[in-house]
């Protein structure tokens, strides 16, 4: 059981966004002997284990046993989880701080996100050869870049009485100290009123776009879009005097993803009859 816990925590630590969940899961299957199929190809399949990656967002894996007509068993799990998602054109300034405009995604428990160092992970879409051939890059800061802080208790005496948080005001993560607007003007990415969709001047891009460009190692003008989520950077752990419990972010729903993966990998190892 200890081995399974360690593998689960390693998996959760790597799956910091839905895109990373698909990528990590795909690599697990390939390392276990699965063959990747392309949706554009015509398939003539014998007994074996196969996986299909659909645009980096969805994964289908199946094992064809010795007697495919024997049984058919299906299991599924969603690769997303409660998180804080970064909105388009997210930079906002307030009282000397630069914050991110975000949305609360899924059934997150708001107060558990306070005072936690937050990293960012997801995918960034870049200009390709033409409008029909764009590139996408996985991004994971692997370090804290933001935080949603609590006020000190002497500034909020009712904090222990059960305070309802205003998501639009009190749940905006702090990204950095505000820079001089004259030295660092911020404008929305892909402003429709701008005659140039990709202006050459670096000052046309907000701090978030510049940050993503640094992470991807590209020019800000190459960024078309992104889907980024914030995540707690602390690692999961086994706890309790007998190691009976697990504490980790993203248990909902990565435990299900890991369980489904473990099942289909085991089906390949035992070469069970039917289709899994």
Locate the predicted segments by residue.
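N-terminal hydrophobic/helix-forming segments and targeting peptides
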Residues: 1-276
């Amino acid at each position: 059981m200890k081995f399974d816990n360690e593998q689960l925590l390693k998996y959760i630590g790597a799956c910091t966004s839905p895109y990373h969940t698909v990528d990590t899961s795909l690599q697990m299957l390939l390392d276990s002997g699965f063959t990747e199929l392309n949706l554009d190809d015509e398939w003539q399949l014998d007994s074996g284990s196969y996986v299909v990656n659909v645009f980096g967002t969805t994964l289908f894996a199946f094992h064809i046993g010795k007697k495919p007509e024997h049984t058919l068993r299906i299991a599924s799990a969603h690769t997303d989880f409660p998180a804080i998602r970064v909105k388009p054109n997210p930079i906002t300034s307030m009282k000397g701080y630069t914050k991110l405009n975000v949305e609360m995604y899924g059934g997150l428990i708001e107060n558990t996100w306070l005072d936690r160092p937050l990293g960012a992970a997801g995918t960034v879409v870049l200009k390709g050869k033409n409008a029909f051939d764009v590139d996408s890059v996985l991004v994971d800061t692997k370090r804290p870049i933001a935080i949603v802080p609590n006020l000190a208790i002497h500034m909020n005496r009712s904090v222990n009485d059960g305070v309802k948080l205003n998501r639009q005001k009190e749940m905006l993560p702090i990204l950095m100290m505000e820079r001089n607007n004259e030295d660092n003007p911020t404008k929305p990415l892909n402003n429709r009123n701008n005659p140039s969709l990709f202006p050459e001047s670096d000052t046309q891009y907000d701090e978030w776009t510049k940050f993503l460009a640094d992470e991807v190692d590209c020019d800000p003008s190459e960024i078309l879009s992104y889907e980024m989520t914030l995540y707690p950077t602390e690692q999961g752990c086994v706890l309790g005097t007998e190691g009976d419990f697990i504490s980790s972010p993203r248990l909902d729903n990565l435990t299900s993803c890991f369980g489904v993966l473990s099942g289909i990998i085991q089906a390949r190892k035992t070469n069970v009859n039917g289709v899994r």
